[in-house]
A protein has these predicted regions:
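A general structural signal for well-ordered secondary-structure junctions
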Residues: 185, 255, 351-354
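N-terminal leader/targeting and assembly helices and adjacent pre-domain segments
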Residues: 1-175, 304-391
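Conserved structured core elements
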Residues: 166-173, 183, 195, 199-211, ...
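Acidic, glycine-rich two-metal-ion catalytic cores of nucleic acid-processing enzymes
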Residues: 195-306
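Contiguous, non-catalytic segments that form substrate-binding/exosite surfaces or channel walls
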Residues: 133, 137-229
Length: 391
């Protein structure tokens, strides 16, 4: 069988262009809102009347709507291209595999109706992102649409200035920091969780891609009348035991399984948790299963190679020891912090808060240096594209 085109690293990189697009939208909206919080007067001289006058001007909704509309249009185009590519590469892979198995090619492996349904579902997920997104404020208790976030900042400043607690300048610093820190979020209506907009975009892409790949895999297995699948493998796989017997993905990755019990290979449902949220092809899982034809297919990794897949990864850094999996999690954590600081820098710059912007710049330089040193120590490539905030 030819090599399956959607390896874990390929799957991990696929959503990044669209995730980056939504980070750019977040940056644009932050700039649009925070730039309108500036007043010409010295902060200590600003009165409540000045703030109310500023509030009456509001934010130009046309600019916000234009930014969202442009992002939606670009994302739909890129999403269609991505899905068409996934379909084409799956079709090519399984056509070659069926030829090697000396079987007659089917007219259609996955019908156009099924593909269109998955495409529409994925497009709907992206429309939901722009329809439900908002900025997280009030210490995470409230999520406001972008246009209302501006009024919230001024209302909060009015209350604080009227009480005599702090000046307008200090109130705006707090509001700007909170807007940037929480960032642009999207509500997951099933779980109620509020994801960052780029995380929601990545998940929408991965769900669509996973559904398409699964359809092709299952249809090919049915056509070839095989109950066997080979599971992909990657370095730094989850190796932490959990509630489920399949929680440690490292234990079962890279091997061959059957959909039947008592077969020559272990059961894929019992060992890998296929179909479970925390199992194979579940939430945040980059592993895929590929059709295995006994006597034709060859394993991608030997057992010995799997035993050494994490060699050279992981490290001891600043007094703490990390496994390969823990190192990838720590790297992601630092990336999220860098993105947060970049949002703050953008917001402070837009609001004309020069001192705060410079302070964030210092933090960014230090954290970038730590990120580079940690990635090198852990043997991990730097994922700079994950930290981009577009300008």
């Amino acid at each position: 069988m030819p090599k399956y085109p959607f390896s874990p690293p390929v799957l991990d990189a696929m959503p990044e262009e669209l995730a980056e697009l939504y980070r750019g939208l977040e940056d644009t909206l932050l700039t649009e809102i925070c730039s309108r919080l500036k007043l010409r007067d010295e902060p200590n001289e600003v009165t409540v009347q000045d703030i109310k006058a500023l509030r009456s001007h509001g934010v130009d909704l046309k600019e916000i709507e234009k930014a969202i509309r442009q992002t939606t249009g670009i994302s739909e185009k890129k999403l269609n291209e991505l899905i068409d590519d996934v379909v084409e590469r799956n079709q090519k892979y399984y056509t070659e595999g069926i030829d090697l198995a000396r079987a007659t090619q089917p007219d259609v492996l996955v019908d156009a109706t099924t593909i269109d349904a998955i495409k529409r579902q994925t497009q709907d997920a992206f429309r939901n992102i722009t329809a439900s997104m908002g900025f997280l404020v009030d210490a995470g208790r409230t999520m406001l649409p972008p246009a209302k976030a501006y009024q919230w900042a001024l209302d909060a400043a009015t209350v604080k200035v009227e009480s005599g607690a702090i000046s307008y300048g200090q109130a705006i610093k707090e509001a700007v920091r909170e807007l940037a820190s929480g960032g642009l979020r999207v509500v997951d209506y099933e779980s109620g969780h509020r994801d960052h907009v780029d995380v929601a975009a990545r998940r929408a892409v991965m769900t669509g891609v996973s559904q398409l790949c699964s359809k092709y895999t299952e249809q090919a297995a049915e056509y070839l009348e095989t109950p066997y699948y080979e599971v992909s493998a990657h370095a730094g796989a989850r190796d932490v035991p959990g509630r489920s017997p399949w929680s440690s993905h490292k234990e079962w990755q890279g091997k061959v399984y059957s959909t039947r019990s008592g077969d020559i290979y272990p059961n894929i449902y019992e060992v890998c948790g296929l179909g479970a949220v925390d199992g194979l092809e579940g939430v945040n899982c980059r592993h895929r299963r590929n059709v295995w034809v006994e006597g034709v297919s060859e394993r991608t990794y030997t057992d010995e190679q799997l035993d050494h897949i994490d060699d050279g990864l992981g490290c001891t850094f600043e007094g703490k020891t990390y496994t390969a999996y823990e190192a990838t999690q720590e790297q992601r954590k630092v990336e999220r912090t860098i993105r947060k600081l970049k949002r703050e820098k953008t917001a402070y710059n837009a609001a004309g808060l020069t001192d705060e912007e410079q302070a964030v710049n210092i933090k960014l330089r230090r954290l970038n240096a730590k990120y580079k040193a940690f990635s090198k120590a852990a043997g991990l490539p730097e994922q700079r594209e994950r930290m981009k905030v577009l300008y």
